[in-house]
Design a protein with these regions (language model features):
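Gly/Ser/Thr-rich loops at beta-strand to alpha-helix junctions
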Residues: 78-84, 151
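Short Gly/Thr/Asp-enriched flexible loops that form oxyanion-binding sites at enzyme active sites
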Residues: 84-92, 159
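Conserved acidic residues
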Residues: 72, 140, 170
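Active-site-facing substrate-recognition patch
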Residues: 16-71
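Short, glycine/charge-rich flexible loops or terminal/linker lids adjacent to PRPP-binding catalytic cores
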Residues: 95-142
Length: 204
């Protein structure tokens, strides 16, 4: 369903003004109205936010687990996928899961770090895990999670982290694939999130 939407993108933040347009998304049988947010004058995207939505988190975790390949550990890049990562670990009975941080943290016993250059922006993305966690995933099958796959940059950086730590990428999963990302044949997702025109219609 479309409503009148006003949304602005500044840096890494979306600024939304009421009234706003939404897009009704069916996520493996559960429906949510996603606000449409402006990225450029001719491009709007649907804002899928799993934070704070317990029903959505539990539902998506269960549906992804039904489709998941065999794995030993779950790993996700921070931060939007954290609720999903936790809930999938909880539902599967896992004792632990791993989070790739954007920088070193004081609690880490040591730092295992990778730097991956972005294909689209040429910037360098840093991902970090504790060296103790890196040791645990060595030789193990690691299932990589994210909330939405769009450019795939976060996914590629996380894959490189797993490989450099000596782990095996068991699979790549997300709730949604945005835009052309749905054409990737090496990902498992629950649905396709289209891109939008300024009037709220789906881009061809």
């Amino acid at each position: 369903m479309l409503y009148n939407v006003k949304c602005y993108f500044i840096g890494y933040y979306f600024i939304k003004e009421d009234p706003f347009m939404t897009y009704e998304m069916d996520i493996a049988g559960l429906k949510r109205d996603l606000p449409l947010c402006k990225v450029t004058d001719d491009l709007y995207i649907g804002a899928f936010v799993i934070f704070g939505d317990v029903e959505l988190t539990v539902h998506c975790a269960a549906e992804l687990l039904k489709r998941a390949p065999e794995y030993d550990y779950l790993l996700a890049p921070e931060a939007k996928s954290i609720p999903l990562l936790y809930e999938m670990a909880r539902q599967s009975g896992a004792d632990e899961y791993f989070l790739a941080r954007k920088g070193p943290k004081a609690y880490m016993s040591g730092v295992f770090e990778v730097n991956v250059k972005s294909i689209t922006t040429m910037s360098v993305q840093k991902l970090v895990i504790d060296t103790a966690d890196a040791e645990k995933i060595k030789g193990k099958r690691v299932l990589i999670l994210d909330d939405v796959i769009s450019t795939g940059e976060s996914l590629r950086a996380t894959e490189e982290l797993v490989r450099q730590a000596g782990g095996i990428v068991a699979g790549r999963m997300a709730v949604l694939a945005e835009g052309d990302a749905i054409n990737q044949d090496d990902i498992i997702v629950l649905g396709h999130l289209p891109l939008f025109n300024p009037d709220g219609t789906v881009k061809a």
